[in-house]
Amino acid sequence: MTLPGHPTGMARPRGAGPCSPGLERAPRRSVGELRLLFEARCAAVAAAAAAGEPRARGAKRRGGQVPNGLPRAAPAPVIPQLTVTSEEDVAPASPGPPDREGNWLPAAGSHLQQPRRLSTSSLSSTGSSSLLEDSEDDLLSDSESRSRGNVQLETSEDVGQKSHWQKIRTMVNLPVMSPFKKRYSWVQLAGHTGSFKAAGTSGLILKRSSEPEHYCLVRLMADVLRGCVPAFHGVVERDGESYLQLQDLLDGFDGPCVLDCKMGVRTYLEEELTKARERPKLRKDMYKKMLAVDPEAPTEEEHAQRAVTKPRYMQWREGISSSTTLGFRIEGIKKADGSCSTDFKTTRSREQVTRVFEEFMQGDAEVLKRYLNRLQQIRDTLEISDFFRRHEVIGSSLLFVHDHCHRAGVWLIDFGKTTPLPDGQILDHRRPWEEGNREDGYLLGLDNLIGILANLAER
């Protein structure tokens, strides 16, 4: 992403760029062109059969011979069914990660890439146990599904015709499939299962719409923070539900490593705290989550009830992590090999957080430099953002993404709990939170995060 006013662009196609010099894409053909090729081939085969031309190979003879060398008429060919699975439209341009030199790439939407496929499993806070299902929805991606726009041919069962149709299948399919050998599948970190769907368009994903997040994204697209958040492309309907069309932040990375960092000193709204006090609701599921981390954490009364309230659980959750001490906490990490690390619930001290980032970046000094520069750009932009000063930002994350080609990016994500302040009120985002002042500690956390990475860079 760039500072405000700098055009954002789409990531370079996978297989291009510094990681694979000299590689070129296979020729691109639209579905319409492929259909014409297919129909022309079928017509040629049918015409040859109707004219009684001999087969070039494998012509059978009675008893192994054709009398007098005369050709035997070939059976009428069975034309395979052509199935076009999707549109041939080119994906719209959307912002992407920087190139090897750290420059944000210009818009380029001339190539249709494989859409990613969402996993139906949820790793809460990148965890394998759903300990933090109340946290906001974040996504990672690691493998792609079959491209929309593929052309599939159902081959004839006639052995004699099989080779003809196999040639056509190859002719039609290879231009579409060959540029995209490496595929990834979605992994959802934190949040509720089923929040995301594949968009079916390169560079985009769908997230289940909520009124608060829709409100925020519309306003963010007109704010200086536009280049620091996923590009928003409107709302679409899928299976009777509304979804937000968002930029796929992993598009253009090769085997991305991803870290989700939840920002702020709290992940609950003040109004949630008030409502919980007025109408307390005991949660057995949260009691079990608390017990799984620390059997001594519940009080005697909570042990007797075998339940806790949500505010009690969330305040405890933030107290055992770095949220209250540093203004952020690490939710989870997905490595390039697809493995997820989620054991950060008690990662609290600056030293512990530093070790986690060292492990995440694996000593890549170039990635560290780019992360640090990007965080400083984001902080500068937040400090002049009218949207930021007039909103309480709760449950939002910074998403860190890098790959082995030293591409790296950081974005603000998740605005489902971001709420506007009463007219005339603004936040400092660094002042300590006291109930009633609505301070979230976002910039406090970002200052500490930048300090930790700056210390790493000096080593």
From Swiss-Prot:
Localization, UniProt: Cytoplasm, Cytoskeleton
Catalysed reaction, written as an equation: 1D-myo-inositol 1,4,5-trisphosphate + ATP = 1D-myo-inositol 1,3,4,5-tetrakisphosphate + ADP + H(+)
Enzyme class: transferase
Disulfide bonds: none
GO biological process, one term: inositol phosphate biosynthetic process
Keyword Nucleotide-binding: yes
Record region (Disordered): 1-26, 49-164
Domain of life: Eukaryota
Function noted in UniProt: Catalyzes the phosphorylation of 1D-myo-inositol 1,4,5-trisphosphate (InsP3) into 1D-myo-inositol 1,3,4,5-tetrakisphosphate and participates to the regulation of calcium homeostasis.
Protein name: Inositol-trisphosphate 3-kinase A
Organism: Rattus norvegicus (Rat)
Gene: Itpka
